[in-house]
Curated annotation (Swiss-Prot):
The gene is fmt. The keyword Transferase applies. PANTHER family: METHIONYL-TRNA FORMYLTRANSFERASE, METHIONYL-TRNA FORMYLTRANSFERASE, MITOCHONDRIAL. GO terms for cellular component: cytosol. GO terms for molecular function: methionyl-tRNA formyltransferase activity. Keywords: Protein biosynthesis, Transferase. This is Methionyl-tRNA formyltransferase. CDD domains: FMT_core_Met-tRNA-FMT_N, Met_tRNA_FMT_C. InterPro entries: Fmt, Formyl_trans_C, Formyl_transf_N, Formyl_transf_N_sf, Formyl_transferase-like_C_sf, GART_AS, Met-tRNA-FMT_C, Met-tRNA-FMT_N. (6S)-5,6,7,8-tetrahydrofolate binds at residues 112-115. Gene3D superfamilies: 3.40.50.12230. It catalyses: L-methionyl-tRNA(fMet) + (6R)-10-formyltetrahydrofolate = N-formyl-L-methionyl-tRNA(fMet) + (6S)-5,6,7,8-tetrahydrofolate + H(+). It comes from the Bacteria. Attaches a formyl group to the free amino group of methionyl-tRNA(fMet). The formyl group appears to play a dual role in the initiator identity of N-formylmethionyl-tRNA by promoting its recognition by IF2 and preventing the misappropriation of this tRNA by the elongation apparatus.
Length: 317
């Protein structure tokens, strides 16, 4: 290939940086511009931290811009010549007039097996739904969210041991390898686009703060999946006596007969493994817990260190 593939890349978190890393490593690619969300204050000290995409771009001497809305830089983009606009977890709506600036196509690395899980939180929802598989779809971007035809998709297994953190990591590796494997073939028009089956479309909006609260009237499996989907951030929570407790990890366990009629949310046991709580159908063993204002600890500390703020027969709201 004589001419380099010219790319404008849009992305923000680590999974976006994984795709950018692949592009940087490809000799066939020239990255014309990197676009990322504005830097935000992080943590208790509210320090301004570069997005992972911006950090990687600066380390590789790439030009980076961070508009509040990408439409603000339309005139600048229109002056550039580029073959692809490539996005992965950018986090902004991109107007159609910008999508049309790419000579060949505007494509997105979407974190699900489309048409399932269109929307902003596909990786979290795959876990929340209890799915056993998910994957990456390289798709055309169109005005309607995640509705474009796609070039290719690859799947990976979701293990019971996965949470959002580990699944994001695995999906990042998959997106990285797919970028290297397929971009040149897409450039050379070696793919036939595949239409999404509209009868199989599902959606996933961003998980709201209200949905982060555990409902103990749900099944153990549903609560287990919710906890995994929100770990390591923002972390699901429960309350008792107006006190909030975050729960980072858990395990589904069976009930003994004497506790089958207990009210969901009741603490049934505190032992060397953790804290046992009644759910709709079984019990949940809490493995990691954080009282508001304190550090995250192993729930077994309640037994080993005789912590007294949670007791057997207490009931979470």
């Amino acid at each position: 290939m004589q001419n380099k593939i010219k790319v404008v890349f849009c992305g923000t978190p680590k999974i976006g940086a994984d795709v950018l890393k692949a592009l940087i490593e490809m000799n066939q690619v020239e990255i014309v511009l990197v676009i990322s969300q504005p830097d935000k204050p992080i943590g208790r000290k509210k320090q301004i931290v570069h997005t992972p995409v911006k950090k990687l771009a600066l380390e590789n001497n790439l030009k980076v811009v961070q508009p509040n809305k990408i439409g603000e830089i339309y005139d600048d983009l229109a002056k550039l010549e580029f073959d692809f606009l490539i996005t992965c977890a950018f986090g902004q709506f991109i107007p159609t007039k910008i999508l049309k600036l790419a000579k060949i196509d505007s494509i997105n690395f979407h974190g699900s097996l489309l048409p399932k899980l269109r929307g902003g939180a596909p990786i979290q929802y795959a876990i929340k739904n209890g799915d056993k598989k998910t994957g990456i779809t390289i798709m055309q971007m169109v005005k309607q969210m995640d509705a474009g035809d796609y070039y290719v998709q690859e799947s990976i297994d979701i293990l019971d041991s996965d949470d959002s953190g580990s699944l994001f990591e695995k999906m990042g590796h998959l997106a990285y390898s797919m970028c290297k494997k397929y971009l040149v073939d897409i450039y050379n028009h070696k793919f036939e686009l595949i239409k999404q089956n509209e009868d199989e479309v599902t959606f996933c909006k961003n998980i709201s703060s209200e949905e982060e609260k555990i409902n103990w009237n749900n099944t153990s499996l549903d609560i287990f999946n919710l906890i995994r989907s929100l770990s390591p951030s923002p972390i699901s929570y429960t309350t008792i006596n107006n006190q909030r407790y975050k729960i980072k990890s858990s395990k589904v366990i069976d009930l003994d007969n004497q506790n089958k009629n207990a009210i969901p949310g009741t603490i049934l046991g505190i032992n060397k493994q953790g804290i046992v709580v009644k759910t709709l159908d079984k019990a949940l063993l809490i493995l990691e817990i954080q009282k508001e204002g304190k550090k995250m600890i192993l729930a077994s500390n309640y037994y080993l260190n005789k912590l007294s703020d949670l007791k057997i027969n207490d009931k979470f709201d």
